[in-house]
Amino acid sequence: MDQKQIEEIVRSVMASMGQDVPQPVAPSTQEGAKPQCAAPTVTESCALDLGSAEAKAWIGVENPHRADVLTELRRSTAARVCTGRAGPRPRTQALLRFLADHSRSKDTVLKEVPEEWVKAQGLLEVRSEISDKNLYLTRPDMGRRLSPEAIDALKSQCVMNPDVQVVVSDGLSTDAITANYEEILPPLLAGLKQAGLNVGTPFFVRYGRVKIEDQIGEILGAKVVILLVGERPGLGQSESLSCYAVYSPRVATTVEADRTCISNIHQGGTPPVEAAAVIVDLAKRMLEQKASGINMTR
């Protein structure tokens, strides 16, 4: 699917929802956004905020032959370019920024989604068999199964046999959920309903892994399960969300090739509102073809 097709899908879905087509959003200060570049410099300041736009736009090459080329290169990518060297070693500011980004990525893996936040969104919260974050990181197999209490809650509080069941899970990035939720879930649910689909009760799974959607789909009898889950963070990019969609999942028979994945959903990648429109179109095609993953035809 090329960019033109994606834009057409977004326009079609947003028009059916009675909303204006979203305009390009100014990039956030995340690493995925294109920075406004500072001029090449020969000095370093340890007082500079390493998370600021100025620090991310810093050019550390001393006495460049073509400063304009470095500025354009730095503006065109979020990669670690134009950082310069001090002999064979990285410059102090470049190393500090690397360490700061690495710390930020570790923090978002270890953080918890606040229970107050889940309640504020009006979401039912259930858990996998995991009881804490340390166990979540060391026992991924337990994150693929719902706890007995969660199974009872789904059976008693959720709509059974929906066309589409939407699930939100923290995964490996708390920031991905809290930063993108408002811009992806409301338009996604509205788009699915506008398409005439029977949408199940959305809920939040704490400590969930991707494969947990198979058990959810089997319990609720959902035709399509859509899981919005936090991606493993990269250096400086902790807000990236993924969508894993699967048709008629079964714990015993569904394999990874049966899933369709849309990744890199954040303001510096695929905008959440645009992703919502693409997911609506994907769900419709899954129901039409009765397939997902590699079994779908283009």
UniProtKB/Swiss-Prot annotation:
Q: This protein's superkingdom? A: Bacteria
Name a single GO biological process.
amino acid metabolic process
Which GO MF terms does the UniProt record name?
A: cobalamin binding; ethanolamine ammonia-lyase activity
- Which residues are in coiled coils? none
Note on how the cofactor is bound:
Binds between the large and small subunits.
Q: What class of enzyme is it?
A: lyase
Recorded GO CC terms: ethanolamine ammonia-lyase complex; ethanolamine degradation polyhedral organelle
Q: Which residues bind adenosylcob(III)alamin?
A: 210, 231, 261
Compartment(s) of residence: Bacterial microcompartment
The record ties this protein, via Pfam families, to: EutC
User: Which UniProt key words apply to this protein?
Assistant: Bacterial microcompartment, Cobalamin, Cobalt, Lyase
Pathway in which this enzyme or protein is active: Amine and polyamine degradation; ethanolamine degradation
- Its Enzyme Commission number(s) read 4.3.1.7
Please list the cofactors this protein needs: adenosylcob(III)alamin
PANTHER family attached to this UniProt entry: ETHANOLAMINE AMMONIA-LYASE LIGHT CHAIN, ETHANOLAMINE AMMONIA-LYASE SMALL SUBUNIT
Explain the purpose of this protein.
Catalyzes the deamination of various vicinal amino-alcohols to oxo compounds. Allows this organism to utilize ethanolamine as the sole source of nitrogen and carbon in the presence of external vitamin B12.
Instruction: Indicate the family of this protein.
Output: Belongs to the EutC family.
User: HAMAP family from the xrefs?
Assistant: EutC
Assembly and partners?
Answer: The basic unit is a heterodimer which dimerizes to form tetramers. The heterotetramers trimerize; 6 large subunits form a core ring with 6 small subunits projecting outwards.
Q: What is this protein called?
A: Ethanolamine ammonia-lyase small subunit
